[in-house]
Swiss-Prot record:
Residues 160-306 form the TRUD domain. SUPFAM superfamilies: Pseudouridine synthase (SSF55120). The lineage of its organism: Bacteria, Pseudomonadati, Pseudomonadota, Gammaproteobacteria, Pseudomonadales. GO terms for cellular component: cytosol. The gene is truD. NCBIfam families: PRK00984.1-2 (NF002153). The keyword tRNA processing applies. This is tRNA pseudouridine synthase D. Its EC number is 5.4.99.27. Responsible for synthesis of pseudouridine from uracil-13 in transfer RNAs. Pfam families: TruD (PF01142). GO terms for biological process: tRNA pseudouridine synthesis.
Amino acid sequence: MSVLGELDLLGPRAHGAACGEAVLKAVAEDFQVDEVLDIPLSGEGEHLWLWVEKRGLNTEEAARRLGRAAGVQQKNVSYAGLKDRQALTRQWFSLHLPGKADPDLGAAEGADLRILRRTRHSRKLQRGAHAANGFTLRLTGLRAERALLDARLERIAADGVPNYFGLQRFGHGGGNLVDARSCAEQDLLPANRNLRSRFLSAGRSYLFNRLLAERVAEGSWNRAAVGDLLAFTDSRSFFLAGEEECRDARLAALDLHPTGPLWGEGDPPSGAGVLDRELALAGSEPALCRWLAKAGMAHERRILRLPIQGLAWHYPEPDVLQLEFVLPAGCFATVVVREILDLVPTGQTENPCAY
């Protein structure tokens, strides 16, 4: 089986070649994620909400540990989104405990998991309920000219970056996509819910990235065209662009963006030449598109351009770049870094030069 690389799974950069190279995730603390949840919690109800810090632990395993410690079935443990294993992350979980007192969750805690806050609420935590994620990234072993880095960072702060799904979505070497294609060709859906979700997501994400890669290559990823479906940064609804909509000032302000397809049942509702492009993409991957539709996936949209909120940076040491920013839920910090630096595996940098 051939291994799929970054260009196979994502596409070209929008802002030119990387300014240099660095290491990300030399230790878990180098990649910190804080979930941003805009839900006022009532303090009472049959759902126990937990603000959890985890280190080197994926979300699904954390949920299993919390469920076992609470003595509840896994279906009664909820979380808003999946967070990286190789990171220090803080996110919410909820446990459905009707008529039960708060359980002792000490068995779930350890060096890799701490419960920082507990409160009650009347409803469970829904998937995708978080508004955003805040990131603090520490890039070490930096080899780059600082003036070039600063200019690139200013540019992406002003213009955003292509909103690719990151490599994490596709598994090691693109294995999740390989498995998705295999399922599609056999017209099968995995019985295991987590595997099914993982493979369907990989298939949809790949099709979206293919479309976005085409628009990055031609320079139209950040411009609206007649027939595009436009969406605001934090909205799942969209509307068709005509001539007037293409001149909307909110496009230049990075509040409104063209979108691409998250494939599902039926043809995309885009118009004019945009629809032709999206149907041509479907025609190049017919088995995958049929499989996604048959699985009952609804046709959705995702913004092509990723605005970066509150981007700040500094150099705590000559060979270290620290970044802080906020991204909408479902977007990948690694695609931001990709527009700045090449990432090299831990231990493969030479002694860095300080510029």
